[in-house]
């Protein structure tokens, strides 16, 4: 299931340090069976290989998954989480969400 507003396979955020040129991301995204991708979640394609989300995983709304990330099977990723490029997460991973609060006068 891919919910509305999700963006899958966009170019990752990568630049060559000396020339400041954007790095071409020519890889892809693999999403396993029975996986849910929440609204307004972004999953960037890999530089060369694959960004991969394992089967039976649940990705909440407003999650950023960067290029070359590998997420195992049965993962649960809550809202507003950002996963940096080339991170490798194993099977049965679960995490909390990000929250922000500021005083209201």
PLM region spans:
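Structural signal for interior beta-strand "rungs" in well-ordered beta-sheet cores
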Residues: 1-105
């Amino acid at each position: 299931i891919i919910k509305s507003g999700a963006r899958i396979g966009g170019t990752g955020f990568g630049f060559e340090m000396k020339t400041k040129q954007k790095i071409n991301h020519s890889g892809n995204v693999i999403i396993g069976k029975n996986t849910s991708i929440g609204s307004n979640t972004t999953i960037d394609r890999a530089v060369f290989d694959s960004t991969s989300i394992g089967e039976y995983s649940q990705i909440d709304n407003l999650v950023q998954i960067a290029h070359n990330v590998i997420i195992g099977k049965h993962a649960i990723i809550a809202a507003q989480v950002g996963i940096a490029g080339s991170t490798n997460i194993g099977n049965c991973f679960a995490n909390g969400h990000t929250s922000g609060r500021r005083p209201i006068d």
